[in-house]
From Swiss-Prot:
Its main location: cytoplasm. Residues 142-177 form a coiled coil. It is found in: Cytoplasm. The lineage of its organism: Eukaryota, Metazoa, Chordata, Craniata, Vertebrata. A zinc finger (RING-type) spans 16-61. It comes from Pan troglodytes (Chimpanzee). This is Tripartite motif-containing protein 10. Residues 292-481 form the B30.2/SPRY domain. One of its GO terms (molecular function) is zinc ion binding.
Length: 481
């Protein structure tokens, strides 16, 4: 079989001088040179300097007649055979590998250089001292390694498939559990809704009863007052008529008339009976247990919901000059010594407070504040609206855009419209603040015991920012997620 180098050499001999590609429909002109028919036709169509002169051969410049070129069938057959040899040479490399450099069949493998060599390559100086093996002999240990790798990989694949099957079953079990829990949640909330609707019906029925009793007593009161008014009107009319009579008629039975008028007193009835008033006053107390239970339910629910840990840091641009911030902006300490801080618009100048660096505009977020009041003082934690007052006195209540609690030795206060002192089982020193922006919850819990502290409900429409305040020498806090 012809070597690849020989076939390549033959192919070069049947290239068209014009397009440099393999001859297609080769034709011969008068001088004996061969060209592609299409290439020569286009060449003849190019006008020369003298339109009447015959075109010249692109190789030897001999003139020829444009219509004189003849098909070269023998050359066409040669071109076809060479192309077949090229195809066979290319396809045969898988069965009979040929050295690209020498065109000889490859028989050997150099283990030093990991190269496949022909006889000529083996005798070359660079491989003369290397370890040579026949291809099959050299391939044998590699085949053994391949068999071992295949065995190991097949085993790994089986184990992977077993893991996949096992984990799919496990995930299916988990999906079933989630589905069951989903149904439980739906069922429990359906029961809760039913319970709340029943309680609502009971309370509304009681209020309806109070409405009816009030209206009944109002009607009775109006009727009584109307009777009293009529009796007084009759006496007034009698006295006015008596006063208009002559003296003899006026003096007739005057004493009994005056006694009757003087002894007539207004009974001064009350519109609402004391018993009904007490029922009205007692009604809010009947709703308080339900309110407390719902409040505890909401606060405990915060631990079950998926809150994203808020990685917050303190903003030194907002810090009051009496607050010392750590370099990592995770800790603050109260000091009576004023810091040399610029009076920028963001800074609190009266309230010893500081805000977090970034605000919150949506989602559920939670963070923990660890408080140290070993030397007294107090600490305030919560959230504020981004437009909270920074200059002058700051009133800590929801109407001013502040939702916070204050902790001091021995007590905790919820800073609502009116501060409320809270009753807790244990003084919290680590407070978890949980914010649900969309629902409008700001919940405070003891981060250690999970005891609910307080929950604010609000309707947020703008950015809110974590808020912290300190008062008292040595009081401090630090943040964690």
């Amino acid at each position: 079989m012809a070597s690849a180098a020989s076939v390549t050499s033959l192919a070069d001999e049947v290239n068209c001088p014009i397009c440099q590609g393999t001859l297609r429909e080769p034709v011969t002109i008068d001088c004996g040179h061969n060209f592609c028919r299409a290439c020569l036709t286009r060449y003849c169509e190019i006008p020369g300097p003298d339109l009447e002169e015959s075109p010249t051969c692109p190789l030897c410049k001999e003139p020829f007649r444009p219509g004189s070129f003849r098909p070269n069938w023998q050359l066409a057959n040669v071109v076809e055979n060479i192309e077949r040899l090229q195809l066979v040479s290319t396809l045969g490399l898988g069965e009979e590998d040929v050295c690209q450099e020498h065109g000889e069949k490859i028989y050997f493998f150099c283990e030093d250089d990991e190269m496949q060599l022909c006889v000529v390559c083996r005798e070359a100086g660079e491989h003369a001292t290397h370890t040579m093996r026949f291809l099959e002999d050299a391939a044998a240990p590699y085949r053994e390694q391949i068999h071992k790798c295949l065995k190991r990989l097949r085993k790994e694949r089986e184990e992977t498939q077993e893991i996949q099957s096992r984990e799919n079953k496990r995930m299916q079990v988990l999906l079933t559990q989630v589905s069951t829990k989903r149904q439980q949640v739906i069922s429990e909330f359906a029961h809760l809704r039913k319970f709340l609707e029943e309680q609502q019906s009971i309370l509304l029925a009681q209020l309806e009863s109070l409405d009816g009793d009030i209206l009944k007593q109002r009607d009775e009161f109006d009727l009584l007052i109307a009777g009293e008014s009529c009796r007084f009107s009759a006496l007034i009319e009698e006295l006015e008529e008596k006063n208009e009579r002559p003296a003899r008629e006026l003096l007739t039975d005057i004493r009994s008339t005056l006694i009757r008028c003087e002894t007539r007193k207004c009974r001064k009835p009350v519109a609402v009976s004391p018993e009904l008033g007490q029922r009205i006053r007692d009604f809010p107390q009947q709703a308080l247990p339900l309110q407390r239970e719902m409040k505890m339910f909401l606060e405990k629910l915060c631990f079950e919901l998926d809150y994203e840990p808020a990685h917050i840091s303190l903003d030194p641009q907002t810090s009051h000059p009496k607050l010392l911030l750590s370099e990592d902006h995770q800790r603050a300490q109260f000091s009576y010594k004023w810091q040399n801080s610029p009076d920028n618009p963001q800074r609190f100048d009266r309230a010893t407070c500081v805000l977090a660096h970034t605000g919150i505009t949506g989602g559920r977020h939670t963070w923990v504040v660890s408080i140290d009041l070993a030397h007294g003082g107090s600490c305030t934690v919560g959230v504020v609206s981004e437009d909270v007052q920074r200059k002058g006195e700051l009133r800590l209540r929801p109407e001013e855009g502040v939702w916070a609690v204050r902790l001091a030795w021995g007590f905790v206060s919820a800073l609502g419209s009116f501060p409320t002192r809270l009753t807790l089982k244990e003084q919290p020193w680590q407070v978890r603040v949980s914010l649900d922006y969309e629902v409008g919850w700001v919940t405070f819990t003891n981060a250690v015991t999970r005891e609910p502290i307080y929950t604010f409900t609000a309707s947020f429409t703008r950015k809110v920012i974590p808020f912290f305040g300190l008062w008292g020498r040595g009081s401090s806090f630090f943040l964690s997620s």
